[in-house]
Amino acid sequence: MEPSKLFTISDNATFAPGPVNNAADKKTFRTCFRILVLSVQAVTLILVIVTLGELVRMINDQGLSNQLSSITDKIRESATMIASAVGVMNQVIHGVTVSLPLQIEGNQNQLLSTLATICTSKKQISNCSTNIPLVNDLRFINGINKFIIEDYANHDFSIGHPLNMPSFIPTATSPNGCTRIPSFSLGKTHWCYTHNVINANCKDHTSSNQYVSMGILVQTASGYPMFKTLKIQYLSDGLNRKSCSIATVPDGCAMYCYVSTQLETDDYAGSSPPTQKLTLLFYNDTVTERTISPSGLEGNWATLVPGVGSGIYFENKLIFPAYGGVLPNSTLGVKLAREFFRPVNPYNPCSGPQQDLDQRALRSYFPSYLSNRRVQSAFLVCAWNQILVTNCELVVPSNNQTLMGAEGRVLLINNRLLYYQRSTSWWPYELLYEISFTFTNSGQSSVNMSWIPIYSFTRPGSGKCSGENVCPIACVSGVYLDPWPLTPYSHQSGINRNFYFTGALLNSSTTRVNPTLYVSALNNLKVLAPYGTQGLSASYTTTTCFQDTGDASVYCVYIMELASNIVGEFQILPVLTRLTIT
């Protein structure tokens, strides 16, 4: 290798051009300097980055703060507007649900009061079409068809002694006469009543007439009410009207009957339903009667029977209870084929395989006594504004919600609809439902039924369907004993036990004897007040309660069919009592 031109090598190991220590020191210094410069630059860069980041953050925070401030302001504005709107809505809701109804009711009462004042008859001048207006005493108007108890608290009851008043129900006048099947409806302005007057003992398939009356509630000098009869119609035209239901309507009464001169069993055995009659009786003595053919009747029903219990005037419609025999192979019969309702008393259940009990419950709708027809409940619904020109419709509830069809009553209390169904089949307890209708201008209307579980007492029944039986079986038994609810029923858990109702029961499990006034809760009787002597025979009972808003007294009229040893088999008696609630 060629020697370096920069160095002179000798044995003394010396270098040219200068000393080795100076060069090394300079190199070390340069390295340190460079490291220092790079470090300073790095630190500076980091500081710049941090500073820029902080500036960006501050800028962003300021913008976000401004945005949040703007949003907060808008939320506050919206909250103010919502609060204002809610305040207005609360005023509207209170006005519509509380103030307006009270004002309307007050105006109505004022109008009725004015009518009662100006509608008088003097010796020379009469300013009315009739001497007495068809308007109840103002003390009672506001206490009719209202729940007597609005809370769900525990209460005690006392049924007073029967009050002495003139009976508004005439009796038979011969030993072989018979008055039966009372139907009573109390409206805000007046009441309507009807019963059947049978010419040959109590065989209603032969020949009978129909007694109809209307009147008002007035206060007697004794302080308690009296049912003052203002109009009477006695329908004696050769038609054998049966099982009539009555309803109060504007200025009069509406009555739904069917006409038949054969046995009930023969009606069910046939295939063509008997004549259906709708009769309108007004305070001006006008009587209009129509033969109706409700939609869904022909081809589906072997027979259709009014429910006996009263109907209602509701939302410009006339609604009556009905029941009858559905032809199994008809359109309606096929639709209902597999439907059944089997209530259970948890305190006294029926034992056995569930599937077997369900099958027996289904078969109970087809009693052989009534030619194996499906015995079905229904409602006759008629549009009031076209009552003279259009037919009515039959609205049929699902049998998944109701027991076998039977006599019944439709109640309207505090604008809530309830339906009593006679316990004609195997179930021995009172049957009461809350109901709601869905009406349509075209097509089929519908009804929903919600059973109210009552287990406090049973009706008398015969054979295997006595009051002690709680298991499904096909039978036709029982008796009509409608209740009057004193409180609204609530589905809220824990308060249902304080649902109270009153009526007249027959205190026997097998025989129609021992009429007894009662007040009951769902599961137990609160008060029992026997009427008459032990063993007294009785039959149908219907009950209506109302309040004297002048002194807050509560009255109930229990209309009962009682045995008579003097005139006829039964005498229909209205028993008026004061009900004390504490």
UniProtKB/Swiss-Prot annotation:
Catalysis: reaction(s): Hydrolysis of alpha-(2->3)-, alpha-(2->6)-, alpha-(2->8)- glycosidic linkages of terminal sialic acid residues in oligosaccharides, glycoproteins, glycolipids, colominic acid and synthetic substrates
EC numbers on record: 3.2.1.18
Top EC group: hydrolase
Protein name, entry field: Hemagglutinin-neuraminidase
Oligomer status and interactors: Homotetramer; composed of disulfide-linked homodimers. Interacts with F protein trimer.
Topological domain ranges for the Intravirion compartment: 1-34
Keyword Disulfide bond belongs to the record: yes
Keywords in alphabetical order: Disulfide bond, Glycoprotein, Hemagglutinin, Host cell membrane, Host membrane, Host-virus interaction, Hydrolase, Membrane, Signal-anchor, Transmembrane, Transmembrane helix, Viral attachment to host cell, Viral envelope protein, Virion, Virus entry into host cell
Annotated site residues (Binding to the glycan motifs of the host receptor) in this chain: 180, 242, 264, 323, 369, 407, 422
Topological domain spans for side Virion surface: 56-582
Localization in the cell: Virion membrane; Host cell membrane
Free-text function comment from the UniProt entry: Attaches the virus to alpha-2,3-linked sialic acid-containing cell receptors and thereby initiating infection. Binding of HN protein to the receptor induces a conformational change that allows the F protein to trigger virion/cell membranes fusion. Binds to the glycan motifs sialyl Lewis (SLe) and GM2 ganglioside (GM2-glycan). Neuraminidase activity ensures the efficient spread of the virus by dissociating the mature virions from the neuraminic acid containing glycoproteins.
Stretches that traverse the bilayer: 35-55
InterPro entries found in the cross-reference section: Hemagglutn-neuramid, Hemagglutn/HN, Sialidase_sf
Keyword Hydrolase part of the UniProt annotation: yes
Glycan attachment points: 127, 284, 329, 400, 448, 507
Comment, domains: The C-terminus (head domain) is involved in binding the cellular receptor.
Membrane topology: Single-pass type II membrane protein
Family, per entry: Belongs to the paramyxoviruses hemagglutinin-neuraminidase family.
Superkingdom of origin organism: Viruses
